[in-house]
Amino acid sequence: MSNDIMGVMARMIILIGGMPTTGKTTLARELSQKLALPWLSTDQTRLVIQGVADPKQYPQLLSAHGLSAAEFFQRFSPEEIAEREYMHGIETWPGNKKLIEDDFTWREGFILEGVNILPSLLPSLQTSSDVRPLFLTDEGDDVLRKAIFSRGLYADADTYADELKEYEITWARLFDQRIQAEAQQYGYPVVRIQKDSEIDIPNVLSSLGLPV
């Protein structure tokens, strides 16, 4: 971010949520360069929590460890997986909340992105920082299908059967619908990503109330 903008703004924290494959990491990286703010992912904070977590306190976060893709999709329906993904956000929220509220390593702020950012949890934040959330969705199932079949969600796409990826399309869309509905309920912007930086970055900046 230019010095003149930073000079008049409070410490700013940008939160980017949404279902998998919407380009949250790519967007966070591009915003980081444009705004001169560091970024990190809830994937990283989740790994830290998993490394020290008690399974009794984090039942959803740890219960599927060691399962192959076939075993995982045999055990859980798409609806159950979407619910599990949502519960991961709830179980990791205390750690992410503390980071947002208490970490002043980055005094000008930072960008935090990931599926673990849930609209329903954000009102619990207590901070003087300028917190600006937004949530991403995509252009539809064709885009989602292409992304999942090319990269995979449970693991690298070439390590498990394509028929299992159909389950991933279903659960990801269910999760997306829930996040969009919650974002609208709490008044947070939802941006439909087109995977074109020249279009997406201005749309995101505008939705965040920042200069384009």
Language-model features: where?
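Short beta-strand-centered segment that lines the nucleotide-binding/catalytic pocket of NTP-utilizing
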Residues: 37-53
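Conserved nucleotide-sensing/catalytic segment adjacent to the nucleotide-binding pocket
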Residues: 51-109
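The conserved Walker
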Residues: 20
